[in-house]
């Protein structure tokens, strides 16, 4: 993307991050995002404006679109996913014997690390299903920016281990075995970590567009 060159004086003149008279600065008008990462993306949009007219038009179309969906997960769930993916404890490849051997120990002894892993895996699985459904059901007349996001989701999922996760968890209510949780955990926090970060960026893009739509 091509960005417009700006400096501190430009930010001050536009009252993007502060004002001299304690007036409401521009970012405060748009900081009503529902997620922390959405807020960071909104600030990035304001601090680094685009100069490419085509990219600007894409953003404008997305912001004024009346069919912007509700966020696919709530703030607490998204925060937990971010925490889980950044969690570096006990990242190891799944082994069925080890998974079976630790079943009883996990039943009788509370393990905070195991809680993070189990809940994190279930939330990521839910995220994958939500994103696939959103991308699949996106209206044909949706803005180009939304279409590009849906295409990115499809490209990441198609033929990948993440698509296999979707197939294996078609019934989200079905309880996952310890071995499956261990297998998915290694996939999410190691093998396909960057892919999941890209998928999460779609949620934050929706958050920014929804917020700008409300304020505008």
What are the functions of these language-model segments?
Residues 1-216:
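Conserved amphipathic alpha-helical "coupling/scaffold" segments
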């Amino acid at each position: 993307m091509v960005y417009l060159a700006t400096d501190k004086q430009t930010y001050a003149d536009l009252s993007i991050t502060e004002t001299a008279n304690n007036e409401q600065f521009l970012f405060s008008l748009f900081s009503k995002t529902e997620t922390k990462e959405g807020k960071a993306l909104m600030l990035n949009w304001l601090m680094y404006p685009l100069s490419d007219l085509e990219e600007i038009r894409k953003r404008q179309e997305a912001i004024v679109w009346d069919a912007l969906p509700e966020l696919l997960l709530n703030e607490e769930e998204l925060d937990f996913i971010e925490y889980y993916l950044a969690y570096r404890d006990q990242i190891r490849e799944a082994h069925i014997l080890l998974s079976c051997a630790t079943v009883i120990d996990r039943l009788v002894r509370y393990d905070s690390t195991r809680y993070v892993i189990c809940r994190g895996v279930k939330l990521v699985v839910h995220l994958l299903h939500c994103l696939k459904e959103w991308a699949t059901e996106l209206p044909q007349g949706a803005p180009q920016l939304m279409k590009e996001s849906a295409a990115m989701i499809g490209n990441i999922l198609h033929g990948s281990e993440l698509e296999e996760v979707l197939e294996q968890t078609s019934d989200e209510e079905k309880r996952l075995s310890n071995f499956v949780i261990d297998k998915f955990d290694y996939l999410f926090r190691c093998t396909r970590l960057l892919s999941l970060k890209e998928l999460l960026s779609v949620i934050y893009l929706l958050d920014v567009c929804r917020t700008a739509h409300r304020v505008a």
